[in-house]
Swiss-Prot record:
InterPro entries: Ribosomal_uS11, Ribosomal_uS11_bac-type, Ribosomal_uS11_CS, Ribosomal_uS11_sf
Similarity comment text for this entry: Belongs to the universal ribosomal protein uS11 family.
Organism: Porphyromonas gingivalis (strain ATCC BAA-308 / W83)
Any single Pfam family the record assigns to this protein: Ribosomal_S11
UniProt keywords, alphabetically: Ribonucleoprotein, Ribosomal protein, RNA-binding, rRNA-binding
Protein function: Located on the platform of the 30S subunit, it bridges several disparate RNA helices of the 16S rRNA. Forms part of the Shine-Dalgarno cleft in the 70S ribosome.
Keyword presence, Membrane: no
PANTHER family: 40S RIBOSOMAL PROTEIN S14/30S RIBOSOMAL PROTEIN S11
Protein's name in the database: Small ribosomal subunit protein uS11
Alphabetized GO MF terms: rRNA binding; structural constituent of ribosome
Gene Ontology cellular-component terms listed: ribonucleoprotein complex; ribosome
Entry keyword rRNA-binding: yes
GO biological process, one term: translation
Assembly information from the UniProt record: Part of the 30S ribosomal subunit. Interacts with proteins S7 and S18. Binds to IF-3.
Amino acid sequence: MAKKAVAKKKVVRVEAVGQAHIHSSFNNIIISLANSEGQVISWSSAGKMGFRSSKKNTPYAAQMAAQDCAKVAYDMGLRKVTVYVKGPGNGRESAIRTIHGAGIEVMEIIDVTPMPHNGCRPPKKRRV
């Protein structure tokens, strides 16, 4: 029986400066780290980290997702990011703090939340 060839893990290097996109909705948070052209290096979400239902939109879930995403990108060589934050949900600040704590320097934070100029009617308020 022939020996199986063991494939080396491919090490991909990226440039040191990139972008971090944090999409925070009322139900989930999605974090993507990309290079300067916008090609995604690593991504994570609260659902990917194992949180379910209402636990996905907590600051702790955002922290865990950001930690997972930032570790992979840091190992690939990403060191500085411009953060683009979109959405009204919880965990926006905790995700930014976690990315900074993982060794990736945050150069600037830009809020790109889409605001309607009196477009669609919003959903009715909940009565709990």
